[in-house]
C-alpha cells in the first residue's frame, strides 16, 4: 500500500460520469449493475475511471459522448489516453460491477449487468489493454476507491461470496 499524496484530490463518480487524473487523485464510486473500468499507466502514474450504466445507444450525429453508455465512456478514455501522449496498450485495467440487480415485469432477472461486463472485456481486448483483475457479477453493491498514484483499487462488497473474482494469473 502506497501512502496518499500530501495534497489529495478526491473525486466521486455518479452513474454516467468519467474522470481521468494525475497521481494525486483518488476516484470513488458505488456500483450495482453498472460497470466501472479503471485504467492506470504504471510509468506516468496517471489514470481514470468510468461508471457506465448501459452498453450503447444509437448515438445521434454530432452528439457529445455520453458516459452512461460503455462504448462512449471508453471513447472518453481513448481521448484522454491520446491527450496524455500515451497509447492504450501501455495501461493496466481493472473491471468491476455488473451485478444482477434488476428484475423485469415477469420477475425474471434482467441481464444488464452481465452485458455491461461483456462489453468492458471486449473493449479492453480490442484495444490491447491488459485486464489485470476483475470483480464482477453477484447480486450486491460494490464501493470502489481507485488510488491513481499507486494503481490500487480498494473494494467493499458486503455480499461478496457470490461474485466472480479473477486476476490475470488465473
UniProtKB/Swiss-Prot annotation:
Reaction(s) catalysed (UniProt annotation): L-glutaminyl-[protein] + H2O = L-glutamyl-[protein] + NH4(+)
Pfam families assigned to the protein according to its UniProt record, in alphabetical order: CheD
BP terms from Gene Ontology: chemotaxis
Enzyme Commission no: 3.5.1.44
GO molecular function: protein-glutamine glutaminase activity
Superkingdom assignment: Bacteria
Entry keyword Hydrolase: yes
Keywords from the named record: Chemotaxis, Hydrolase
Stated family: Belongs to the CheD family.
Stated role: Probably deamidates glutamine residues to glutamate on methyl-accepting chemotaxis receptors (MCPs), playing an important role in chemotaxis.
HAMAP family per the UniProt record, alphabetical: CheD
Official protein name in the record: Probable chemoreceptor glutamine deamidase CheD 3
Gene that produces this protein: cheD3
